[in-house]
Amino acid sequence: MHKLTPDEAIDIAYDIFLEMAGEHLEPADILLFNLQFEERGAVEMVETSDRWEEEIGTLIDPTAFAEVWVGLVNDKDEMDDVFARFLISHQAENREYHVIWKE
């Protein structure tokens, strides 16, 4: 199985984020993201958490998925405002994904 590269995972997550953010985020969060993204925005692939089962109610194999966060970083370059967390399958022919949106 070909695993997604960080760039591929980031591109997929960001495309989904742009397409769906308007339906899932508060207008104030969308405005904040749009105003701050150029200066503080980040889309990062992180180590796949083993806690997704608690989030989505399905047991997953962390090695079969990439996890990507979309948000804003602080002055220490830490993502302190996460707008969406993505779990994206490495399988290209059956690209499954899950999103946890900021509440």
UniProtKB/Swiss-Prot annotation:
Report any Pfam family annotated for this entry: DUF440
Q: What is this protein called?
A: Putative double-stranded DNA mimic protein HD_0986
Q: Print the organism lineage.
A: Bacteria, Pseudomonadati, Pseudomonadota, Gammaproteobacteria, Pasteurellales
- UniProt cross-references to NCBIfam families, sorted A to Z: PRK05094.1 (NF003469)
InterPro entries xrefs? dsDNA_mimic_put (IPR007376), Put_dsDNA_mimic_sf (IPR036763)
List, alphabetically, the HAMAP family matched: Put_dsDNA_mimic (MF_00680)
Function per UniProt: May act as a double-stranded DNA (dsDNA) mimic. Probably regulates the activity of a dsDNA-binding protein.
Similarity comment: Belongs to the putative dsDNA mimic protein family.
